[in-house]
Each structure stands twice: as structure tokens, then as C-alpha cells.
Amino acid sequence: MAKTIPMIITNNSILIKDKESGEFKTFTMPALIETPNIPFYHQFAEKIAECQYYFKEFMKTIYGKKLSKYIFAIIVPDDTSRLESIFINEFFVNSDTCKAVAQMPMALALQKDENKYVSISKSSRNIVVEYVRNHESVVTKYYDMTTADPNVIMADAAKLHIDLEYESVPIFINNYNMNMDEYLSF
């Protein structure tokens, strides 16, 4: 059975779990320019061969030379589009660092013990409020991250779906980018 490598795509880097220490190591592509509201990995397309080379070399430092036997288990931002998911899969598979890719949005990976919850996350372009029931996304609402009011978002989260109006469901702040301090007081 193939071994998996856990990874998280954040707002500006890729976190890869080190097999020895169990800690996440950060891969940041050199010379990428931060562009508002555009995920950093979009720039990989401009220099795809170079980015794949640097990524493969980085992976060799953590997992050695036989990379193609692994499956990447990647947690992606909640606002990742289907087209972006395809690009992410192709980028990793074609970099000869894995044999397959499995993706899951952050909201679905956030909580394993609760059957119903609301996730609030902030990507490089959106704030995403998502109602999750039985480990599936039921309703998702997007807000512009530059103009959204945390008070409005928290109020909307409580009435995102009819289930939420009649029973108490926990709200989790998905703070993997460490950029949601204004929500932590709720």
C-alpha cells in the first residue's frame, strides 16, 4: 500500500509533513511576487518547469530520492476552484514527486469529532463560511476579505442553513494562516 504525505496549501506556501520529525516544513517558491486576491500557486504556471524542479529538490531533502511511490494528501483552501484543483493535481503529479494526489478542502479536514459544524476561514482572496454536516459541505458562502465585517459574518454563520436556526452547532475559526485574530473573540 502506498504511503501518504500530508500537505497543506496556505496563502503563500506549501506545508509538507516531515516523515522523521512529524513537523511541517515550509516550501516557498523563490522569486514569487505576492499579488492581491490571487493564490501564489497561480504563478507556478508561468515557470512550471522551474517550480516543479525546485519542489522536487525540496521533497528529496525530506523524503529521499524515491518520491514517486507516495500519494500526496493535500488540504487546500476552502475557496479552491475545480480548475485550480486540476492544476494542483497536475503540478504535483507531473513534478515526479508522487503517483497520485488526494485533495480535501480545509473546512472538511477541520473537525473529525463533530458531525455538524460551521467553519470560517480566510484565504488570500475570500472569507469562506461553510456549514458541514456528516463530513460533507452543505452550504458555502463567500465574502470579500478586504471589505467583510466580522460581526456580519458571525451573524450570517448562525443562519447559514435552517439546521443552524433550530439547534446549537459549533463554529470553528479555521486559522491555519494565523490571520483571523478579529474572529477569535466570538
Where are these regions (language model features)?
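Small-residue-rich
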Residues: 17-19
